[in-house]
């Protein structure tokens, strides 16, 4: 009886722990390389940068290249305990003698990174926890929704109550959901889906858009006005050293 009760308590405790909100501070970083320098950036990340990030308390979440990469871009997501930890980690990283040596050697034949874009994010409770795709050779889709003023809560409610499970119905795997941290204006919804391929993604989206259940949910949620103003989508292929495959 004692063993049984202990087991029940463990299960309950695990369930409560699993439902705790993810309070980490996330950063989506996009590096745009000079022509011909993307391979050098990938090599530097794979051989050195990711390890030095971890050394300074930064968690490597995932690394990808766009499937259509006309801007020589590399996308990655880092996680930190909080904003203050992020600042300390980057300051320590920038001052690290090992990093300085790595950077100097890798740029002996020229600069690598032309521009950097950062998006700071909080985890959204749309999805209880960030997942890893179940299959191999996945294609990821990074989607960013800009809502009409004051309509982000409506979008989040629709995702929680309907969209999430309708994506799964059409074989789109929910991986991670975030809301952006903006200096001004409304946050954006940023999320990652996994597909078997871009072709399968196209089939899934076509089926999703004509699904009567989705149409009914969308129309009901928009009775008092449209929700989404703009949608941006980028297909990404994970790099070999990415934790998210």
PLM regions: where:
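Bacterial Sec-dependent N-terminal signal peptides
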Residues: 1-22
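Short S/T/G/P-rich N-terminal loop/turn motif that feeds into the first structured element of a domain
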Residues: 18-216, 220-245
């Amino acid at each position: 009886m004692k063993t049984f009760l202990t087991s029940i308590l463990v299960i309950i405790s695990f369930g409560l722990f699993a439902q705790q909100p993810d309070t980490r501070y996330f950063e989506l970083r996009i590096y745009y390389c000079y022509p011909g320098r993307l391979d050098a950036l990938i090599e530097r990340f794979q051989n050195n940068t990711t390890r030095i990030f971890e050394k300074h308390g930064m968690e490597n979440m995932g690394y990808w290249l766009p499937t259509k990469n006309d801007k020589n871009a590399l996308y990655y997501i880092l996680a930190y305990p909080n904003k203050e930890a992020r600042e300390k980690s980057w300051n320590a990283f920038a001052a690290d003698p090992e990093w300085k040596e790595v950077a100097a050697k890798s740029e002996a034949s020229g600069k690598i990174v032309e521009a950097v874009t950062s998006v700071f994010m909080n985890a959204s409770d749309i999805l209880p926890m960030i997942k890893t795709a179940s299959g191999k050779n996945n294609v990821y889709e990074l989607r960013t929704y800009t809502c009409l003023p004051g309509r982000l809560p409506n979008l989040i409610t629709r995702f929680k109550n309907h969209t999430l499970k309708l994506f799964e119905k059409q074989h789109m795997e929910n991986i991670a959901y975030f809301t952006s941290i903006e200096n001004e204006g409304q946050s954006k919804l940023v999320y990652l889906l996994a597909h078997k391929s871009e072709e399968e993604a196209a089939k899934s989206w076509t089926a999703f858009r004509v699904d009567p259940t989705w149409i009914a949910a969308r129309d009901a949620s928009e009775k008092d006005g449209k929700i989404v103003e703009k949608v941006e989508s980028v297909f990404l292929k994970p790099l070999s050293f990415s934790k998210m495959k």
